[in-house]
Amino acid sequence: MAFPGVRRGLGELIGLRKSDAWYSTEDPRFGLTCRITASTRKLASCTSPWQYADIIQFIASTTITTIMLESLIEQWQIMRQAFAPMRLSRWQLVKLLAAQIHRDNPVAAKIAALLFVAGLFWAVSVLTRPKRLDKKLGLPLIGGSRTLKKDFATVIERGRQMYPDQPFIVNSSGKPFVVYPPSNFDEIKRLSEEEASAQDFFYDATHGYWTSVGTETPALWKTIGIDLARAGAPVVSTKQKDARTAFDRYVGYCPDEKSFNVFDVMMKVVALTNGASFVGREVAGGRWHELVAQLPMTVYFAVIFLTWTPRLFRPFLEPLFFLPHFKVQRDMRRILEPIIKQDLDEWSKTDDKKEQLKVKEGQRLPYHKWLISRYGPGEATPRQLATDQIVTAFESTISTALTIYYILFQLASRPELQDELRQEIADNTTDGQLPSTSLTELRKMDSVMRESFRVNPFALFSLYRITRKPLQLSTGPKLPAGTIFCVDVHHINNSSALFPAPTRYDPHRFLNKREQPGAEHRHQFVSTGPMDPNFGDGTQACPGRFWANNTIKVCLVHVLTRYRLKLKEGHTRPQPVCMPNGSWVPDLKAEVIFQSLD
């Protein structure tokens, strides 16, 4: 059905010509240009009244806008004429006009003010937005400029297929990352902190201004990498007792099958076991270990919410999102205050400093005294020592708990592997007591841990860095200062050239590798290198991996000698989800069934 009369009327009303694609009519007084996106062809093709209604609605809205602007300009001219003798400035006239509009139509004035503020924020956001890194560097952008996908691993796989030996850019939680291929691993690990800093990256990623993560001092770094690593062997016996206390508290005796939330239990067990070494059993057994278990979650939830927040609003919302973290930190500092005061007093009043630095059986580690000995005069303040202790708790808890989490699910699905490890434990213990060593004797267990870490790493990337000055690598363009870059280790952990059948979990994979000539000390859980990329490598590799290795083995020994594990009926091992920042997040609700062996 056609409506020729209506078509002609509309055409005459808006002044269309048959050849026009864009039309403009100008008001002779104010020069107001009204662009109407229509054409005679579109009008001619209208066969439905609804299409005509849309056109009429557009014309009406344009006409109303024009009338409103005419009225506003008319009021402005009247005010200028009326107040001309007073010689008011334009800004004063604008304020008078705004006051008049507010009196005449307060609702419209408020809406206009809100729209103005929103428009101002949008304009500032656009004007201050940095130039896209892919255009600046000339590198391909994979996954789009606003990658917020749960299947982030597929983005990386697609990028590596398209550019197997070249760097590309991904947008990781709103920030551009230059992702280098595995072939650049050795080159990047050799970079000094003055060239590219891992600490700067973690400070940026976890909002270190609010969380203190990434503020590790050289004294703290050396304390963890040297003093704490050496303390692993002497505290094995003590840590076994602490692990027993933790499991008795959160798992207990299970004559019948009983399921537990693995992530929740392991966070508390690790926090309590490690806490006994750092702050003492009595303090750790109180509220301390609960706060330590909460600490990482308060950081990660705040970071996730800020990722979803428009960049312009983040400075205003950061304090709000980190309020739970502030409360946890405040409570932890209050608990630490008397402990640190005692350690500072003992250090200042005793002449034999070396004696105070020794690890003593059944006592908490002299952790604060190690730190004091490495700080310069006046640097080891109570606040600094408390910050170091909190950062240590943050970094040593969730990574260790997650590693045990994944291992327990592998064991629960393999009863024969549990029996095999129990036999190895029996061969290396006396009355259930582990030797006071670094526990390298548990080679099968170490292989199980290393393979689990390969299959379930913390992230798709490693060797995270932020450039501190312009940097030219052997591949790709020159990176300006402040650029985030990393190495794609997803394609190292899943390389069929390095690991035959990489998608299969082989608990003996690294045990077999270590049996090859010259490789008996390689391929361990704590190893670093191009085949062992998850802890990083070089001078900026994770310094706490030796302490974590000790804690994990002690906890696994306790579980395997006390419990039988199995998956819930009809359930399979939970699959982690790859988040838009490249990290793998486990199923936080997954459960495993525990049953006591006797």
UniProtKB/Swiss-Prot annotation:
Pathway(s) served: Mycotoxin biosynthesis
Q: Answer whether the UniProt record assigns the keyword Iron to this protein.
A: yes
**Which Gene3D superfamilies would you find in this protein's record?**
Cytochrome P450
User: What's any one GO cellular component for it?
Assistant: membrane
Provide the GO MF annotations for this entry. Answer: heme binding; iron ion binding; monooxygenase activity; oxidoreductase activity, acting on paired donors, with incorporation or reduction of molecular oxygen
Cofactor(s) needed by this chain = heme
> Which Pfam families does the UniProt record give?
p450 (PF00067)
Keywords annotated in UniProt: Glycoprotein, Heme, Iron, Membrane, Metal-binding, Monooxygenase, Oxidoreductase, Transmembrane, Transmembrane helix, Virulence
Q: Where are the transmembrane segments?
A: 107-127
The way it spans or sits in the membrane comes to: Single-pass membrane protein
Major location (coarse): membrane
**GO biological process terms held by the UniProt record:** secondary metabolic process
Q: Which pairs of positions does the record mark as disulfide bonds?
A: none
So what does this one do? Answer: Cytochrome P450 monooxygenase; part of the gene cluster that mediates the biosynthesis of the mycotoxins phomacins, leucine-derived cytochalasans with potent actin polymerization-inhibitory activities and monocot-specific antigerminative activities. The first step in the pathway is catalyzed by the hybrid PKS-NRPS phmA, assisted by the enoyl reductase phmE, that are responsible for fusion of the leucine precursor and the polyketide backbone to produce a 2-pyrrolidone intermediate.
- PANTHER family, from UniProt? CYTOCHROME P450, CYTOCHROME P450 MONOOXYGENASE AN1598-RELATED
This protein's name: Cytochrome P450 monooxygenase phmB
Native source species:
Phaeosphaeria nodorum (strain SN15 / ATCC MYA-4574 / FGSC 10173) (Glume blotch fungus)
Q: What lineage does the source organism belong to?
A: Eukaryota, Fungi, Dikarya, Ascomycota, Pezizomycotina
